[in-house]
Amino acid sequence: MYPGAGRPTYHKQQEQKGPYGQPQYQQQYAPPYPERYQQPYYQPPPHDGYSRPSMPPPSHNYAAAQYERPSCPPPGYAPHQGGFPAPGPPLQGRPRDLMRSDIQMNHSMDYSNIQGPASYTRPEFVAPPPQERQFLDPGNRSVEYQYSQCTGNRKALLIGINYFNSSAELRGCINDVQNIKNFLISRYGYREENMVILTDDQHDPVRIPTKANILRAMHWLVQGAQPNDSLFLHYSGHGGETEDLDGDEQDGKDSTLYPVDFETNGHIVDDEIHDILVKPLAPGVRLTALIDACHSGSALDLPYMYSTKGIIKEPNVWKDIGSNSMQAAMAYVTGNTGDMFTSLKSLASTVSRKATGSGGVDTERVRQTKFSPADVIMFSGSKDNQTSADAVENGVATGAMSYSFVKVMSQQPQQTYLSLLQNMRTELKGKYTQKPQLSCSHPLDVNLQFVL
């Protein structure tokens, strides 16, 4: 049964608001062995039953000629610098032969000789995730959750959309997918036959990242998941915002992802993604999501978001007002009228909600509604009110956040959740304004070891 059927979900609220309904599945989505790429990443595929977008996603109200991610390189940033590091120590044995004990060994390997750059945060002690069930309220043991040991089966869904031949075209998203795929296989024992890869340079129409294919693949990813399984979702492409209809967003906006056919079939909203990927998971199942897109801070609608100090971030309307004002001013100085008007519109909305009290979302109610006993972790490319950069590193187009994740984990594999967030921000600081975000389906001990 489709997750959320028979209870209030985003689909029922959106029945009159556009094409967000459940796709019509004719058969169960099975992951055939992905074909290897036989063409350059930037070569667009032939038309196979979908229409490439002729204009950019509408969520920012940009004119077609103004929509880029970003419209120009960051000030003071020269292209063709940096790059993905050479792979570090591989796992023992070939990835296809890895057993559960080998995967567990990778989580406890001694990486003391791989400290990473001096600028990185270096955890003094990294504790493994506890095996015991945890309780949301120690005084009330009725609500529990469980960390995953990540020693079971492993599946991955990797999505990269360049939006070829459109004014919304990106250059690094398909490269991101290839880099993440290679990283998961070489470091964490994922197998290519247990991956579904959707990119818009492929000939097989089943592998084009249309809305129906993405939703079908999301169902495949979580189907049959058991405690200690490790699931991985990576999305690199356009993101945006739309009006929040169920009152679970402090800023009044839902995060959205844009499939390649968004013009005809619409975007994918965070409530829908949460219904499919988070709600069905049992305690102890791990889903790690890496969302490299604009406005992606709440792309999975996870209720607990953490700061670089390791504490839960609470909504701050006055801080939002200051942030929107600064973004509008910077856009004015740089001549980016599209960004300026978007920031001013967001500022007006924030001030209005502060004045009327209409933005008073019941944070505790939202946390109870979006809480999951599973172990769902998301690193997103930016805050809900930020854009993410389509960057160039070492002469190769890439998403800035995807690049920082692979680089940090390759140069210093022994990370806590907190140090990983801090070090990813360190990698981007000075070159990009975006700030990667960390969120979770349950209260998270950010000083535990980050495992996959």
Curated annotation (Swiss-Prot):
Biased composition range(s): Low complexity: 16-41
Q: Which UniProt keywords apply?
A: Apoptosis, Hydrolase, Protease, Thiol protease, Zymogen
Q: Does the keyword Repeat apply?
A: no
Q: Which residues form the active site?
A: H238, C294
**Its domain of life?**
Eukaryota
Residue ranges for the region (Disordered) are 1-97
Q: List the GO terms this entry assigns under cellular component, sorted alphabetically.
A: cytoplasm; cytosol; nucleus
Instruction: Please provide the Gene Ontology terms (biological process) for this protein.
Output: apoptotic process; protein quality control for misfolded or incompletely synthesized proteins; proteolysis
Class of the enzyme per the UniProt entry, highest EC level: hydrolase
Q: Which Pfam families match?
A: Peptidase_C14
Tell me its EC number(s), please. Answer: 3.4.22.-
For molecular function, the Gene Ontology terms on record are: calcium-dependent cysteine-type endopeptidase activity; cysteine-type endopeptidase activity
Q: Which family does it belong to?
A: Belongs to the peptidase C14B family.
UniProt function note: Involved in cell death (apoptosis).
How is this protein named in the record? Metacaspase-1
